[in-house]
Design a protein with these regions (language model features):
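Hydrophobic/small/kink-forming positions within alpha-helical transmembrane segments
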Residues: 15-18, 22, 49, 90, ...
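Helix-helix packing/entry segments at the starts of transmembrane helices
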Residues: 39, 112-118, 181-202, 235-271
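C-terminal-most transmembrane helix of multi-pass membrane proteins
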Residues: 41-42, 49, 54-58, 65-68, ...
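Hydrophobic transmembrane alpha-helices of multi-pass small-molecule transport proteins
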Residues: 48, 134-154, 174, 205, ...
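Short, small-residue-biased leader/transition segments that mark boundaries at the very start
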Residues: 2-9
Length: 276
């Protein structure tokens, strides 16, 4: 039952992310990439604050809902691990999401979704250096998934442009993000770590946004719907579900499930944006 719940959580995460490609494409037309990402991540962090407070009331003993069963004497150690995990995830997410957001502005939603999903190959390769081996069956599933994603998302032939290179770098960085989550998630409260990662990502991204883009409040009028979806659903909900759902799960299997986002992105791009 626990495994089925984790699978359901991962499927929901991938679906929300897939639709988020449309929000990113639309929002990126109204405001700069850094401004969009800084705002969405800060919103994601704020959304989780009342959730953390509510869970704290429901769990008055102080034991983290999603943390390991460490003794009360290890509270300082758990908090240090929580902060380190949140900051590490935030840095990875900051780099990955900004490369993706800039890359999407030069590429189609479906193509960006396919290239991003290349983390299904990168994760197991990087995992080998962390002594996380995959069975031949999983490698076969990776190859079949990659072929299927290509046939679904790439309809006009495949050529490499500037945006595609940026999104490919993003795929590598998201692979690191998945592996960092795999390392920290069994030991910390997933909701709290997610909140910290968004705060770190939002602050780091706000720096180049203020320096290079000089955001004006008037520019947000045409982007609030996209920013709110990306902030509340993609960040606040989906990334938090990723941390919770990935707990004690093989990171390669997790990446395969998450690759469903590329299928959803292609479908959403076709329905909502008319991209073929």
């Amino acid at each position: 039952l626990r495994r089925q719940r984790q699978m359901c959580i991962r499927d929901s995460t991938a679906t929300i992310w897939g639709i988020s490609f449309v929000a990113q494409s639309e929002g990126g037309d109204a405001v700069g990439a850094f401004t969009f990402n800084a705002t969405r991540n800060l919103i994601g962090s704020l959304v989780l604050v009342p959730v953390i407070l509510l869970l704290g009331r429901l769990n008055p003993s102080g034991k983290a809902v999603s943390s390991s069963s460490a003794s009360e004497g290890n509270i300082f150690s758990r908090n240090r691990t929580l902060i380190l995990g949140g900051v590490s995830c935030g840095i990875c997410l900051c780099l990955a999401s900004n490369f993706q957001q800039v890359g999407i502005s030069y590429s189609s939603v479906g193509k960006a979704g396919f290239i991003t999903a290349c983390y299904i190959v990168i994760v197991p390769i990087l995992g080998l250096f962390m002594k996380k081996k995959c069975s031949p069956f999983i490698w076969m599933a990776i190859v079949l998934a990659l072929i299927g994603l290509y046939l679904l998302c790439i309809t006009d032939g495949f050529s490499i442009g500037k945006g595609d290179i940026l999104v490919l770098i993003c795929a590598f960085l998201f692979s690191l993000h998945i592996l960092v989550i795999d390392y920290f998630s069994p030991h910390v409260d997933g909701v709290k770590m997610s909140c910290i990662q968004f705060l770190v990502c939002g602050i780091l991204t706000a720096i180049p946004a203020l320096i290079f883009e000089h955001p004006q409040l008037s520019a947000f009028k045409g982007a609030w719907g996209s920013i709110l979806y990306a902030g509340v659903m993609s960040c606040g909900v989906a990334y938090t579900l990723q941390i919770i759902g990935q707990k004690n799960m093989n990171p390669t299997v997790a990446s395969l499930i998450l690759s469903l986002e590329s299928c959803i992105s292609a479908l959403a791009g076709w329905i909502l944006l008319g991209q073929k």
